Amino acid sequence: MVFDFKKEYKELYKPKAKPSIINVEKANFIAVRGVGDPNAENSEYKQFISLLYPIAYAIKMSKKGDYKIDGYFDFVVPPLEGFWWQEGIKGVDYANKDSFNFISLIRMPDFVTKEVFEWAIEETTRKKKKDFSKVEFFTYDEGLCVQCMHIGPYNDEPITVEAMHEYMIEQGYELDITDERFHHEVYISDVRKISPEKLKTVLRHPIKKK
């Protein structure tokens, strides 16, 4: 059976549309970093996320080649995720998207080591005749967070974020966004196929005890 992160880790990919507290364990990702409005034409965001999928599929499809990965199992490539922040702002200013910094990520199974990642970069560069040097191997220990499934357009996220923060305070926590802990989005829906009103996005904010 093909391993599906969305089914095996429902608490991470299918939370309810009401806030909850979760402890997210350390995981490996492939990632790209950039800046600017993600919706702008020819944005770094649109250009860079297209670099992630060939690497993810090279690892997934390695089963058909000569390169054998220790502990390999077949898997569904997980949803795209994103860390977002703006310099000098503790949170997200949706009215000033040009100042966004981002790390876009796709989670990888634990058998994906730095060595496996480097093989995938080399193999994909050779096959695609394209530069994948912006893609990096990224290990992240997210820790304690408040999260909620946001249903609707991205521009309506502040409504869900406000509910998350109210719940967080009620439970005795406070926001802990820092230089290493970010506003986190997990894109469950394919924006190309679903109307904005039905988009599902997991929103996650780092927290700490008061």
Regions found by a protein language model. Name each.
Residues 1-210:
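A solvent-exposed interaction/effector surface
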